[in-house]
Each structure stands twice: as C-alpha cells, then as structure tokens.
A protein has these predicted regions:
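Cysteine/selenocysteine-centered motifs that mediate thiol-based redox chemistry or coordinate metal-sulfur cofactors
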Residues: 18-50, 154-188
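Long, contiguous, secondary-structure-rich segments that constitute the structural scaffold
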Residues: 2-104, 108-112
Length: 228
C-alpha cells in the first residue's frame, strides 16, 4: 500500500511534522531531488488514551501534548489533538492550553465515566477558544463551532448549544469533513452511499464533487464505499 504525508509541513503545523528527515538520502545527481519523494515506511496504530480538537483565535499552548496538528479554520485555527496520558485535572489543563484569564467567562462540561470533556472561553462576549475531548473518538462536527468565531458576540441560543457542539437551528449535520476541497462531510457521503445515490468513486465525484480536487481524500472515500 501507500502512505500519504504532507512533506512541506514543519513545526508550526504539527508536533512531529518534519517528515523530510525520514526520506532516503538518494537524490538525483543533477537536480538534487529525492528519489521521486519515495521512501519505504512501516506504520502502526497510535494507541491514544484520548483524542480531541481545539478551535482558537490565536495559538494553542501545545507543550507536553504528544500529538497535535494545526490547520486554518474559519477565522480560527483548528488543532487536532491526542495523547497516551490522561490529564489528572482536565479543567486546569484546558485553562492553560486555551489561555484563560481572570476576566474571561469559562464554560465547561465533564463526564468522567465516558471520558468526555468540553470547555469554552468567552472574552468580551465573543468566543475566543473551545476544546472538545473524548476517550472513544466520538466528537462533534467542527463546522458550526467554527462559524461561531465570525460572530461579534454570542447570542443566548449559541451559548446554550456551545458545549453540545450542535447548532440550535435544526438542519443536517454533514459530519466530519472528508473532502477539504469541497467541504463534504462523512455523514453526507454515507447518506449518498446508503441511499444508493453514489456507489462508486466516480458517482461520488459527480454528485458531491468529493475526490475531484486534490485527490487526497480518495483513499478515505474508497474505505467508505467498502464499508457502506
């Protein structure tokens, strides 16, 4: 099989993103380019104790977090997080990571039995950062939460729904984004597959455009088709 890894990432976007150091030192004698950017690798599953994500206006404090990857969201930065060690005090851990100050509003929810923790920092009425953590990987979709960063001030409905991670307005939750190029979510893809509207990679591209851009989501689309 093949493993795709973004080769131009650096320490700004990931905790261990400098993968070029692993590339074989076999280069073209003229251009100096590596051997078609090809290197044999061996991979194994990462056995994490928890995983989650944080949305922040600025930078997240990532020191001590075993796995983190940063990407640009809607008026915020999105961090995907995981670690093999469960913090002893989630509230203290989150306050440090999200940059809590005395004047800030702090919302949080914790269910120790299921290993879920959620927190949000509100500053001067607007959402400054939020954190969602789960032991089993069951996390809310990011889209609606990201949209809150565009609001100059959170209304009462948004505040009440914030830690639920779900919009108070009824609508289809398309799930975690699979195709970044066209913002197509997992739930939307599964719906098209289970209803028989997109049973091939080509059909998915025609109906939802997923997989017709950069192509990096094609392996995940194939897995959804195989399991659908």
């Amino acid at each position: 099989g093949t493993v795709f890894v973004p080769m131009h990432w650096n320490d700004v976007f990931a905790g261990n993103g400098r993968v070029d150091a692993l590339v074989n030192p076999v280069v073209d004698p003229i251009s100096g380019e590596p051997e078609f950017k090809h290197t044999p690798v061996r991979i194994s599953a990462y056995a994490c104790a928890w995983q989650g994500f944080a949305l922040v206006r600025g930078d997240l404090e990532t020191d001590g977090v075993a796995y983190w990857v940063r990407s640009t969201g809607t008026r915020c930065s999105r961090y995907e997080l995981a670690d093999t060690v469960m913090p002893g005090d989630w509230s203290a851990w989150a306050m440090i990571r999200l940059g809590h100050a005395e004047a800030d509003e702090w919302l949080e929810f914790q269910d120790a039995g299921t290993g879920r923790y959620r927190a949000a920092l509100i500053r001067a009425g607007r959402l400054e950062s939020c954190l969602f953590v789960s032991r089993d990987g069951n996390l809310p979709a990011r889209q609606w939460l990201e949209s809150l960063f565009a609001a100059p001030e959170l209304d009462s409905a948004a505040r009440m729904s914030l830690l639920a991670g779900r919009s108070p307005v009824a609508g289809e939750d398309q799930g975690e984004i699979v195709c970044s190029c066209f913002q197509v979510g997992r739930n939307r893809l599964l719906k098209a597959i289970t209803q028989g509207e997109a049973l091939t990679l080509e059909a998915i591209g025609q109906k939802l455009q997923a997989g017709t851009g950069c192509g990096s989501c094609v392996p995940e689309l194939k897995r959804l088709l195989a399991n659908g």
